[in-house]
Structure formats: C-alpha cells, structure tokens
Amino acid sequence: MFWGIEISKVPVKFTPAFDLHITTACLSAVAKDTGRNVLQVKYDGKTYSLCSLKLNATEHSVLDTNFEEGKEVEFSVSGNNTICLTGYFVDSMFGDDEHGEDEDNEEEEGEEGEDEEMEGEDEDEDEEDEDEEDEDEEEEDDEEDDEINKELERQILEQALKRKAQIEADKNKQQKKPKQEEPVKQVTPVKPTAQAAKPTAATTTTTTTTTTTPTKQTTPAKPAAKPVTPTKPVTPTKPVEAAVVEKKKPTSSVVTLPSGLQYEDLVVGSGPSPKSGKKVGVKYIGKLTNGKTFDSSLRTPFTFRIGIREVIRGWDIGVASMKVGGKRRLTIPADLAYGRSGAPPSIPPNATLIFDVELVSCAQ
C-alpha cells in the first residue's frame, strides 16, 4: 500500500498502522531556496539524519528505511524547502506468506539444482563419448590415409622394380648378341691371311654397335621418377587447419541495450520472471569502474517493487528480463544511475556503476 507525506521545518509526528518502508526522499516541486536541506527523523527518543538535499544539485535520494507499526515517528527538515517522502506499508500477513513462498522456492531451486547437476553430468558424459568417437574417427581416417599412402608407395615400388628389371633384361639381350656373333671370328683353315682380315672388320663393326646401342636403351629410365607425384593427396589437411582457426574465434556474451545499459548473464535462471509493480528480492554488490565497492547486500536480499522507479532506472531495466535463480552483471551509465550529482561521498558525479545482481525471489 502506497504511503507519502510532505515534511517542512515544522515537525510532523506519525504513528504507522503497519510496518512502514520508506524508499524515496526528494525536494518539493515548488522548492526555491538553494541552501542545504537535511531530512531528520526522531525515533525511540533519538534524532537521526536520513539524507541531505540541495536544489539544482542533489534533489533526490533513494532510502531503504523501515519503521515498526505502532511506534511513533517524528519527521522534520533543517532548511527552508519542503521534502516529499514516499514509501509503502508492509503487511505482516503478506510478509509471512512471502517468507513461506521463499522457502518453497528455495526447496524447488534445490531440487532443480540437483536435476541440473544430473543433466550436466549426463551432458559431460555425452560430450566425452562424442570426443572419443571423434578421436576414433580421426584415428580411423589417419589409418586409412596411411594405408592409402602405403599402397601408393607399394605400387610405385613395384613399377620401379618392373622398369628396372625390363632395363636389365634389355641390357642382357644387347650384351648376348655380340657373343652369338663371336664364332664369326674363327678363321677357316688353309685360307690366305688377307681374307682372314674381313672377319676382323666385321667384329669391329659389331663391337661398335654393341657399345652404342645400350646407351639408347637407358632413356626409358626417366619415367621411373614420375610416379612419386601421388604423394600430393596429403594436402587436404588445410581445410582442417582452417576449421580449427574458426573454432578459436571468441564470442561475446555482453548485451548492449539502446538505453546504453550493458548486461552479461553469469548464470541463467530457471524460475519465473518479475512483473511490473511486483516486489522482487535481490542480492547484489555494487562497484565503481576502478573496482572500489560502494554498496552490497549479500546476506539479506534487498526488496523493491520493479518498474515504478523505487530504484535507479538501470536496475528497473536490467532486472526486469531476469529469472529467479539468475545472476547478471549490469554496467549502468551515469544517466541511468545517479547522473551529474552522484551520491556523495561514495558515488562521484557522472559515475558508471557495475552491479553483480542475483534474483532470489519475485512475487507473482
């Protein structure tokens, strides 16, 4: 249930009928004084300062303050402007139901986590089986390539041996021919020595032919070098290298929205998504771009109603698309956070903020 009140210099006493959660303090629309305005609250006999606002500098402040029902609260302003406070009543009955729902959600998330672990183990086993199958296929391909190369080498060797044997056979034939003509050298008896000179001439001619002809037969040895070319089929390894290079290309998981907000899902939730105007619970840690932590809520979830500007715009936009159980890193530019004024002293002006947010609950 919505609650609002205007506070000025005159103290205002108020006793809430239900637990009260104050979320926002801002200067009135008719504020004119440029001096500092400090919002103070008196509770349990003690006075506390909630925030300090200044016209044209810090006109708005996000609060997270709770007051118990039935306990008197006194608000006042130290300054000349009026400050508007807004928040909502927290119904105790609704809080108990929500607490029960959170416990149920935790149990369901535990069961879902176990199922996801089992599924993850099955997927890991499937991936290992696939990797082993791929390795077996690669080994089979390598073995086939080795067998093909061995077969080519065997064929080349057989061809070379056949050609070598053919050349040797041709040489032997050429060498045998002069030996068969050698009987011509025998001189018939009782013949003049002049006639015996003729066979010698014949022998010289035959010897010249035998010495010249083998050189012509050596030329067929050239084709023996050509069969070496079948080793080229090894080149198909290039597409494999290209495929490996393509796998190494990085893929970015950061999403940039038109508003300038960036988010990266660290864990994708499996629960329901928030609805506008409904209360959500988140655990978070906020850092500046230099890594300095300025705020966090890791033990107790921070609760707010999404989509109605109870928090900075970067949260309304970044949390709206999450699911319960999800974890997301939000990089929020200054215009979606605290703008030019910042939130001194922890957040400087024009600061880009980085939040690691976990959505733990959302009302449906």
Swiss-Prot record:
Catalytic activity: [protein]-peptidylproline (omega=180) = [protein]-peptidylproline (omega=0)
InterPro entries xrefs: NPL, PPIase_dom_sf, PPIase_FKBP_dom, PPIase_Fpr3/Fpr4-like
Enzyme kind, highest EC tier: isomerase
EC number(s) on file: 5.2.1.8
Activity regulation (record text): Inhibited by both FK506 and rapamycin.
Compartment(s) where it occurs, according to its Swiss-Prot or TrEMBL record: Nucleus
Amino acid composition bias (Acidic residues), ranges on this chain: 94-148
Compositional bias of kind Low complexity: 185-239
Cellular compartments per GO CC: chromatin; nucleolus
Main location: nucleus
Domain of life from the UniProt record: Eukaryota
PROSITE patterns assigned to the protein according to its UniProt record, in alphabetical order: FKBP_PPIASE (PS50059)
Record domain PPIase FKBP-type: where: 277-363
Function statement: PPIase that acts as a histone chaperone. Histone proline isomerase that increases the rate of cis-trans isomerization at prolines on the histone H3 N-terminal tail. Proline isomerization influences H3 methylation thereby regulating gene expression.
Quaternary structure (record): Binds to histones H3 and H4.
Name used for this protein in its record: FK506-binding protein 4
